[in-house]
């Protein structure tokens, strides 16, 4: 019979222990008096907790692996508060259990010691024995292996077959700055209990961070750590204002590394080049770019009102669609032209450098008059993408009474994909109401809302998709603000469905 206990002596991590009594008769209903007395003594001892009964004698590690790992494999405590990176201050020596084996059997043995071997990125699990060149030392997990009794039966069997002594030795392993992960370094440096930043957006060789106020005193150190710990990153920048100017770019500060903001990125098998300091680019929208691209079929037409450097326009053009792409920012316009040539779609994309409203009321109006006037057999599907979440809904007013003449069939009316931010408790309904208010109609039953991403706590980015009603698009049409004659684009998403999707996406972020 075996008693399992949790032993947590003062000042040490807890460990599970199994204690066996060879003289006890097994019984499902009766525990001998002597064993009962021992149990009571153990329960009264400081730091000991009764867990259950088993049938072997061994020492077991506690289960909170992550917490224990941070205790041993964390930087020295005296780096706390460091604002200028000193890599030499991260040296630390830890005591690691090792198993001495002949070098010719290492490979064969390691396959059987996966559980027991040390699993730590950046640390070699097998090293040369400094006292015997014909032998090797296998690093073992210090939270699983304490003595030879810590090995499992199968592991001991393999050791016996290979004539390896299970005797455990100790090895002083020196940890340096190179051995620690970026999150471990920042957690050790920043004030205790404060959030650390281990994530960033990668734009080619640039790491783009959004630091919080409490992290700013450590900003240069954080930038250098990001460069050190992420191969290929040679510059770290921090956004120092919101995207609130007319060109959608933001001011940034180079925290560490080179000043060069000219970069090249690959997204969905397409290449884009640009000056990141002068244009807008968000790598977190890659999935959204693909989603919209999949909605169009060869021969369709896309009007991209706020095209940036081309993440919507170029993939759509590659599908043999006709694309009209516009951006007010001269730098975006320049790189949009460049990237169209780079991706060999310059013959399929017409590029403009206009204000969004002027683009809609000029080139878009002219093209729509021609497209919607074609015979039914030749009419393509028309899509309008408006990716300017802070203001795009305001530009919907440009569609009001945009066209003259007799309305086309409702099935050929343009489909709008308009992006917006929302901090509302019901963001989908909020976006519907605001977009409908600008158009002067209700979009309640004729639109779908897609949650693009969670931007910040209580701030969502969404895309509302709908067909522009003929009563809005054409002059001299009777309008009913509560409803209109055009069929819904698709079944309306319920608030519950949107809430479920939001919860799922936030949990994956």
UniProtKB/Swiss-Prot annotation:
**GO cellular component terms attached to this protein's record:** cytoplasm; mitochondrial matrix; mitochondrion; nucleus
Q: Does the keyword Nuclease apply?
A: no
Its GO biological process terms? mitochondrial tRNA methylation; tRNA N1-guanine methylation
Q: What is its EC number?
A: 2.1.1.228
Q: Which domain of life is it from?
A: Eukaryota
Instruction: Give the subcellular location.
Output: Mitochondrion matrix; Nucleus; Cytoplasm
- What SUPFAM superfamilies does the record tag this protein with? S-adenosyl-L-methionine-dependent methyltransferases
Q: Mind listing the UniProt keywords for this protein, alphabetically?
A: Cytoplasm, Disease variant, Methyltransferase, Mitochondrion, Nucleus, Primary mitochondrial disease, S-adenosyl-L-methionine, Transferase, tRNA processing
**Alphabetized InterPro entries for the sequence:** MeTrfase_TRM5/TYW2, SAM-dependent_MTases_sf, TRM5-TYW2-like_MTfase, TRM5/TYW2-like_N, tRNA_Gua_MeTrfase_euk
Q: Where in this chain does the entry annotate a coiled-coil region? A: none
Q: Provide the reaction this enzyme catalyses.
A: guanosine(37) in tRNA + S-adenosyl-L-methionine = N(1)-methylguanosine(37) in tRNA + S-adenosyl-L-homocysteine + H(+)
What GO molecular functions are on record for this protein? tRNA (guanine(37)-N1)-methyltransferase activity; tRNA methyltransferase activity
Q: What is its main location?
A: mitochondrion
Q: Where does S-adenosyl-L-methionine bind?
A: 289, 327-328, 355-356, 387
**Region ranges (Disordered):** 478-509
Q: Identify which top EC class this enzyme belongs to.
A: transferase
Q: Which disease is it linked to?
A: Peripheral neuropathy with variable spasticity, exercise intolerance, and developmental delay: An autosomal recessive mitochondrial disorder with multisystemic and highly variable manifestations. Affected individuals suffer from a peripheral neuropathy, with distal muscle weakness and atrophy, and distal sensory impairment. Additional variable features include early-onset hypotonia and global developmental delay, poor or absent motor skills, exercise intolerance, poor growth, cerebellar signs, spasticity, and seizures.
Q: What function does this protein fulfil?
A: Involved in mitochondrial tRNA methylation. Specifically methylates the N1 position of guanosine-37 in various tRNAs. Methylation is not dependent on the nature of the nucleoside 5' of the target nucleoside. This is the first step in the biosynthesis of wybutosine (yW), a modified base adjacent to the anticodon of tRNAs and required for accurate decoding.
According to the record's subunit comment, the protein's assembly and interactions are: Monomer.
Q: Which family does it belong to?
A: Belongs to the class I-like SAM-binding methyltransferase superfamily. TRM5/TYW2 family.
Q: What PANTHER family does the record tag this protein with?
A: TRNA (GUANINE(37)-N1)-METHYLTRANSFERASE, TRNA METHYLTRANSFERASE
Spell out the HAMAP family in the cross-references: TRM5
| Protein name per its UniProtKB record | tRNA (guanine(37)-N(1))-methyltransferase
Species, as recorded: Homo sapiens
Instruction: Please name the gene that encodes this protein.
Output: TRMT5
């Amino acid at each position: 019979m075996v008693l399992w206990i949790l032993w947590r002596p003062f000042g040490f991590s807890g460990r599970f222990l199994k204690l066996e009594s060879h003289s006890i008769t097994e019984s499902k209903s009766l525990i001998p008096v002597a064993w009962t007395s021992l149990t009571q003594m153990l329960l009264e001892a400081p730091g000991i907790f009764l867990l259950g009964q088993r049938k072997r004698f061994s020492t077991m590690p506690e289960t909170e692996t992550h917490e224990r790992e941070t205790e041993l494999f964390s930087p020295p405590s005296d780096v706390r508060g460091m604002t200028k990176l000193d890599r030499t201050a991260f040296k630390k020596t830890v005591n690691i259990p090792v198993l001495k084996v002949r070098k010719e059997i290492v490979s064969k043995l390691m396959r059987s010691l996966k559980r027991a071997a040390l699993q730590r990125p950046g640390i070699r699990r097998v090293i040369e024995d400094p006292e015997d060149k014909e032998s090797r030392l296998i690093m073992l997990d210090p939270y699983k292996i304490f003595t030879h009794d810590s090995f499992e039966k199968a592991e001991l069997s393999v050791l016996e077959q290979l004539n390896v002594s299970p005797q455990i030795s100790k090895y002083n392993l020196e940890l340096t700055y190179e051995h620690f992960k970026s999150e471990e370094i920042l957690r050790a440096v920043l004030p205790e209990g404060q959030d650390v930043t281990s994530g960033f957006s990668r734009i080619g060789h640039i790491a783009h961070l959004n630091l919080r106020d409490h992290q700013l005193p450590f900003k240069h150190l954080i930038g250098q750590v990001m460069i050190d710990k992420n191969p290929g990153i040679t510059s770290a920048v921090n956004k120092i204002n919101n995207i609130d100017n007319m060109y959608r770019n933001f001011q940034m500060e180079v925290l560490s590394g080179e000043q060069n903001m000219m970069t090249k990125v690959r997204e969905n098998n397409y290449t884009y080049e640009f000056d990141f300091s002068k244009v807008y680019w968000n790598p977190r929208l890659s999935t959204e770019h693909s989603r919209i691209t999949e909605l169009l079929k060869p021969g369709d037409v896309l009007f991209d009102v706020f095209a940036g450097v081309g993440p919507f326009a170029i993939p759509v053009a590659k599908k043999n669609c006709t694309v009209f792409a516009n951006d007010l920012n001269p730098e975006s316009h320049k790189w949009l032209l460049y990237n169209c040539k780079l991706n060999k779609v310059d013959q399929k994309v017409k590029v403009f450098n206009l204000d969004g409203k002027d683009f809609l009321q000029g080139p878009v109006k002219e093209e729509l008059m021609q497209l919607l006037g074609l015979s039914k057999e030749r009419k393509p599907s028309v899509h309008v993408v408006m990716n300017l979440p802070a203001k795009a809904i305001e530009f919907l007013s440009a569609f009001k009474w945009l066209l003259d003449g007799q309305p086309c069939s409702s099935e050929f009316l343009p489909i709008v994909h308009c992006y917006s931010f929302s901090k509302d408790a019901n963001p989908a309904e909020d976006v519907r109401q605001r977009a409908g208010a600008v158009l002067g109609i209700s979009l309640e039953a004729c639109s779908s809302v897609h949650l693009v991403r969670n931007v910040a706590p209580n701030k969502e980015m969404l895309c509302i998709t709908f067909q522009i009603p003929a009563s809005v698009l054409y002059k001299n049409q009777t309008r009913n603000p509560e409803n209109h004659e055009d069929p819904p684009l698709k079944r309306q998403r319920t608030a519950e469905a949107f809430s479920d999707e939001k919860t799922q996406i936030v949990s994956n972020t």
